[in-house]
Curated annotation (Swiss-Prot):
Stored Pfam families: EF-hand_7 (PF13499)
SUPFAM superfamilies assigned to the protein according to its UniProt record, in alphabetical order: EF-hand
Entry keyword annotation includes Calcium: yes
Organism: Lumbricus rubellus
Lineage of origin: Eukaryota, Metazoa, Spiralia, Lophotrochozoa, Annelida
Protein name (record): Calmodulin
Residue ranges occupied by any EF-hand domain in the UniProt entry: 8-43, 44-79, 81-116, 117-149
Residues that bind Ca(2+) 3: 94, 96, 98, 105
């Protein structure tokens, strides 16, 4: 499962993992898991967290090592990219419902999520996803971006 992650994703997960592995012993506690997941843009419920922990905490000691964490994140990412969830996410960003995400709409949603981005950062995000170069993101471009993350 974890072998389907890109090197960039693995590096991101390692960075997040080590931020919460306070004593550097290579494991994180179950309490810290929710914080790690949220830092990576996931938003699991308490029940989902408990399920994930139970699935990967093989020895039942309440801690998760990095290989277990990678497996869990790979599973979680695969699950969250269903077409219906991507469509819902697109609708959240496409405030006026015109089928496009503008820089203003992107900035609005990111600000509501607590991400304070500069205009340059927002423009860069649009540029990265904007395949046809029209300055906004349509549904196909959004799907492509979501599937490649």
């Amino acid at each position: 499962m974890a072998d389907q992650l890109t090197e960039e994703q693995i590096a991101e997960f390692k960075e997040a993992f080590s931020l919460f592995d306070k004593d550097g012993d290579g494991t994180i506690t179950t309490k810290e898991l929710g914080t790690v997941m949220r830092s990576l843009g996931q938003n699991p419920t308490e029940a989902e967290l408990q399920d994930m922990i139970n699935e990967v905490d093989a020895d039942g000691n309440g801690t998760i090592d990095f290989p277990e964490f990678l497996t869990m994140m790979a599973r979680k990412m695969k699950d969250t990219d269903s077409e219906e969830e991507i469509r819902e996410a697109f609708r959240v960003f496409d405030k006026d419902g015109n089928g496009f995400i503008s820089a203003a709409e992107l900035r609005h949603v990111m600000t509501n999520l607590g991400e304070k981005l500069t205009d340059e950062e927002v423009d860069e995000m649009i540029r990265e996803a904007d395949i046809d170069g029209d300055g906004q993101v349509n549904y196909e471009e959004f799907v492509t971006m979501m599937m490649s993350k």
